[in-house]
Amino acid sequence: MICFQEQKNGAPMQVQGIGPASARLLHSFRDVARFYQIQKHKEHPVQLRNAEMCCEYIRPLFSDPKREEFYMIAMNDDYVPLKEIYIASGIPNRVQFDTHKLLRDAVASQCTCVVLAHNHPSGLAAASNADLLATQAIILALGQVGIDVLDHVILTPTDWFSMAEHGRVPQYNPGTGQLLFAARATWPMEPEKPKQIKR
C-alpha cells in the first residue's frame, strides 16, 4: 500500500512514481469514501449502541484533519440518528461554539438524546479541562429542554476517546437543575440482537 502524506505547506511529498495528477487522485479517494459512508448511513439507518459505533458513524464527517471540528448526532429514543449537526470549526487546538445555536439546532431536530463529537488533530485521544467544562455546559443547556447527552467522543486520526466510558459525562437532574457527577451507565442499551430499524 502506498502511504501518502502532505508537507506542512500543503504540497504533496515526493514519492517515486507519483506525479501531481496521481497525488490529486489519491486525495480524491478519501473524499469519495467519506461521501459513500455518509450516504450509506442515510439510506440504512442504524442503532448507535455504544461509543465505538458512534465514532465509526461520525468519523466520515470530519473533513479537515488540520483543525478541530465539532458535531452533534441527534437521535431518537431508539438511538437511531435523526440528523448529524455541524456545530463549529476552529484552529488545530481549539474550537469555539455558540451554546444557544447548539440548543436551537438540537430542539429543531426533534431528538431526545445526542452524542457530541469533536476531533483532536494533535492525535491526543483524551479530554482536556476545556472539553469537560464545555460538555457540562451543554448537558445543562440541553437538560433544561429534556434532551439527554449520552456521550462526548473525541476522535484522532488513529484513535478515539469516550468521555462516558471514562465516567466524565454527568447526568442532568431535572428536579434540581443540577448535574449529578455520580457514576452512570456508560451507555443506556446494549441489545444482544440489533433491531430492524425504519426511519
Predicted regions mapped to residue ranges:
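Short, solvent-exposed loop/turn segments at secondary-structure junctions
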Residues: 122-126
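Divalent-metal-activated hydrolytic enzyme cores
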Residues: 136-199
